[in-house]
Amino acid sequence: MIGITQAEAVLTIELQRPERRNALNSQLVEELTQAIRKAGDGSARAIVLTGQGTAFCAGADLSGDAFAADYPDRLIELHKAMDASPMPVVGAINGPAIGAGLQLAMQCDLRVVAPDAFFQFPTSKYGLALDNWSIRRLSSLVGHGRARAMLLSAEKLTAEIALHTGMANRIGTLADAQAWAAEIARLAPLAIQHAKRVLNDDGAIEEAWPAHKELFDKAWGSQDVIEAQVARMEKRPPKFQGA
């Protein structure tokens, strides 16, 4: 479900589920986690993460095992692996990054975004709640006001606007991302490791307040989540009740 190639000091990892728009199931998450962890065993000094086909990652595979009991823990381990990697991870965002795909993009240290790509958290369309890290990191990358629009109304963030906010560092292709990663790989690795560690320790990872956890659990355990799934299968708008 992933492809791994290396050119000199740049390791490229490609999500390879184009038929599902690279949606994350447990197997893909596990393979990606292991690839990130093993990346430091060789001569690589930078990682490029991209998706095969027209999407970077369409989020969690809602038709698969995304609601399995251990799926959230697997996803957390993936994010921990990316955060702990001593190498910079450059996201080559080749298409839409939605939901868990946007979380994956935000965990990258830098992002080169295709002109027709966009970012979206459609959680309010599915009755779901986001963890605190995702909300805090989104706010730091796009600004508080735009984060509110994305979270409360499921607004899409285009590549052009993402470049202005800082979500996108550059507009470009996979080749552009690989070229940038090659430049970075020639820089001093210890200096990069220190900068990455300090930047990532920005307070976005926090213990949820009791009120946050209560509302989070209430959303995930609600009938609205079931209604969203049923409506999706029946191809109709959901009728949310707030319960």
Swiss-Prot record:
It comes from the Bacteria. One of its GO terms (molecular function) is enoyl-CoA hydratase activity. CDD domains: crotonase-like. Coiled coil: none annotated. It holds the Pfam family ECH_1. One of its GO terms (biological process) is fatty acid beta-oxidation. Belongs to the enoyl-CoA hydratase/isomerase family. Its EC number is 4.2.1.17. PANTHER family: (7AS)-7A-METHYL-1,5-DIOXO-2,3,5,6,7,7A-HEXAHYDRO-1H-INDENE-CARBOXYL-COA HYDROLASE (PTHR11941:SF169), ENOYL-COA HYDRATASE-RELATED (PTHR11941). PROSITE patterns: ENOYL_COA_HYDRATASE. This is Probable enoyl-CoA hydratase EchA6. Keywords: Fatty acid metabolism, Lipid metabolism, Lyase. It comes from Mycobacterium tuberculosis (strain ATCC 25618 / H37Rv). It is an enzyme of class 4 (lyase). GO terms for cellular component: peptidoglycan-based cell wall; plasma membrane. Could possibly oxidize fatty acids using specific components. It catalyses: a (3S)-3-hydroxyacyl-CoA = a (2E)-enoyl-CoA + H2O; a 4-saturated-(3S)-3-hydroxyacyl-CoA = a (3E)-enoyl-CoA + H2O.
